[in-house]
Regions:
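Subunit-assembly interface segments of extracellular/virion macromolecular structures
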Residues: 1-177
Length: 177
């Protein structure tokens, strides 16, 4: 099979796929997965300005360094936001056990007693809001497009967001070079 013939076959198959999709789906339709979830039950934890929030990304934090799961308060880190302007480094968390961390307390990344941070002394915790999109397939411009799972912090210091949530597409040409 020569390159020209292969290109013709790919074009024919794409056109058939596009026609089937156009018949069944509206442009931008969700085909498989891709559920959108708003979560206003997450909590922010402000750290002291000398700490780096990204060290805790996607980890589990605890109020004790003894062993994994031994802390009385444990939380899954949903998002870690480093120091931005006058905003302190902030962790967005979902509690596993307990309901809050004490102001000024030291937190530990489970499985690493060396990774610690100190919670800010004032205005250290409160409600936040995030939106998540699960992995899914959408029909866009005649193509079935895979969308990776994503989480976005809507309001890091409020659990009452006022946004419209959606996806945008970026088209690019990928070649062999």
């Amino acid at each position: 099979v020569q390159g020209r013939e292969l290109t013709q076959l790919q074009t024919i198959l794409q056109k058939q796929s596009s026609r089937l999709g156009d018949h069944i789906f509206k442009d931008g339709s969700k085909v498989l997965g891709g559920e959108v979830t708003l979560d206003t039950e997450v909590t922010y934890l402000k750290l002291t300005t000398t700490d780096t929030a990204s060290l805790f990304a996607d980890g589990v934090i605890s109020d004790t360094s003894v062993t994994v799961g031994a802390g009385t308060t444990r939380a899954q880190v949903v998002s870690a936001i480093n120091l931005v302007g006058s905003d302190a480094p902030t962790l967005i968390v979902k509690f596993i056990s307990g309901t809050s961390f004490t102001a000024g307390a030291t937190i530990y990344l489970e499985g690493s007693t060396a990774t610690t941070a100190t919670i800010a002394a004032v205005a250290h915790t409160g409600g936040a809001s995030i939106v998540s999109v699960n992995r899914g397939v959408y029909f866009v411009n005649g193509f079935f497009v895979l969308c990776a799972a994503q989480t976005l912090v809507l309001e890091k210091y409020s659990n009452t967001p006022t946004y419209r949530i959606g996806l945008t597409t970026t088209e690019s040409i990928v070649d062999s070079t």
